[in-house]
A protein has these predicted regions:
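Arginine/glycine-rich "motif VI" loop of SF2 helicases in the C-terminal RecA-like domain
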Residues: 51-54, 103-118
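Short, hydrophobic beta-strand segments that form beta-sheet elements in well-ordered domains
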Residues: 118-126
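Accessory nucleic acid-recognition modules appended to NTPase machines
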Residues: 1-81
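Active-site ExK catalytic segment of metal-dependent nucleases
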Residues: 76, 81-93
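Residues immediately flanking
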Residues: 12, 87, 127-128
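Mg2+/Mn2+-dependent nuclease catalytic core
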Residues: 90-110
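Switch/connector loops and helix/strand junctions flanking conserved nucleotide-binding motifs
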Residues: 17, 94-95, 131-136
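Domain-level recognition of nuclease-like catalytic cores that cleave nucleotide substrates
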Residues: 125-149
Length: 149
């Protein structure tokens, strides 16, 4: 699987403070808010992944291929089990994220060129969803507030 580590700040508020943004300014700048939200989710996912049994070296990575397919997070255990997660601030972007996850699954797991096993699950983590739900076989939408220890 062509994954790469991606670097994030330990606390996304550091970047927001460095930009001199207060909460109102951040809410007006949806792109920066989305980047800070992704950083927040990644921080939490890194902590949760480290607590998993059979965790490998650099278990949380980013996927991008030459065809432009991007997936925000791949979590892989040492035994080869893996999950793919997209991170989207708003519910409006869930369909695009689900399509990216489906494309990743088709590319890596199906057809003559398949080189890896099916993911254990795939999910879209959102900022403003009302509830967690299953949108397709093995694909879930999970509001960030549902990610608790």
């Amino acid at each position: 699987m062509a994954t790469k580590p991606k670097r994030y700040l330990a606390d996304p508020s550091l970047a927001v403070a460095q930009l001199g943004m207060d909460p109102q300014a951040l809410m007006r700048d949806y792109q920066t808010l989305g980047l800070a939200f992704e950083n927040l989710c990644m921080r939490d996912l890194l902590v949760y992944a480290e607590a998993l049994p059979d965790i490998g070296f650099e278990p949380v990575r980013y996927y991008r291929d030459d065809a432009g397919l991007e997936v925000a997070t791949i979590i892989e255990l040492a035994d080869g089990r893996w999950a793919a997660l997209e991170i989207k601030l708003s519910e409006d972007k869930v369909d695009d994220a689900v399509n990216s996850l489906r494309r990743l699954q088709r590319k890596l797991c199906r057809g003559d060129a398949a080189r890896t096993r099916e993911p254990e699950f795939m999910a879209v983590i959102t900022g403003f969803s009302q509830y967690a739900r299953q949108v397709d076989e093995n694909i879930y939408v999970i509001p960030i507030r549902c990610l608790t220890a």
